[in-house]
Amino acid sequence: TSCCSTVLIFPPTGAGAPAFQSMSVLEGDTTVWGYCPPGRGQRLLEPGIRTIGEFVSNFRSSFEIPTGPLILAGVSFGAMLSFVAANILENDGIFATRLVALCGQSPKSYRGEREGWNLERARQRMRSYGLTPKSILNSDESDDLFVRPTLDDLLLAESCCGNQLKQIHVPITCVSAIDDKIVSSEEAVQWREATSETYRLIEVTGGHYAHEGFGRREWLNVFS
């Protein structure tokens, strides 16, 4: 990347900008924007985004195209949202420099199937994934501040149907953690089908949220 590059990165389910604290090492190398509108990580009790149609509308109205190269990226479900964003931009004749999918299921794995998510199931999922400390989940404010945004994201994810999205004309870099217990390595291979351009696979260790342990060298490698 160069100093004029902008990275627009989408957080994992229920997470916000703090999920990308490790990217602070990129200061001076690139500009980083975390995409966290209502329902995508803000903890201010706004109505959540629960359908992909709402997400598309929100993205179109809120995103200003930067000058210079634009890299789209996302972690876990955020990788799918970065792919949706690439489709939106291409429909408007705007092409990103690269898409970086970090430990995310491939677009074809999103089939628009209803899974019956509710607050209790969302809370159980948060406990099993381990991204949110149990002490926070047990607090009185946890439902409104943490569980509800996660539920919004889960409902948003189940409204996605990858077969309805076109193959993008942007190079894809796929980061796969070989010790990821949530997303299999086969998903990384299937990302190859999501682009008509070049595909690059980077294998790392550190589990599903391996990006949290990245330093400057690792981040620059995945964005190069």
Residue ranges and their predicted role:
Residues 1-40:
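Short, surface-exposed "cap/lid" segments of acyl-processing enzymes
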Residues 34, 38-68:
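Active-site loop/oxyanion-hole signature of alpha/beta-hydrolase fold enzymes
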Residues 37, 98-110, 129-131:
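Active-site nucleophile loop of the alpha/beta-hydrolase fold
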Residues 181-187:
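Conserved alpha/beta-hydrolase "acid-adjacent" motif
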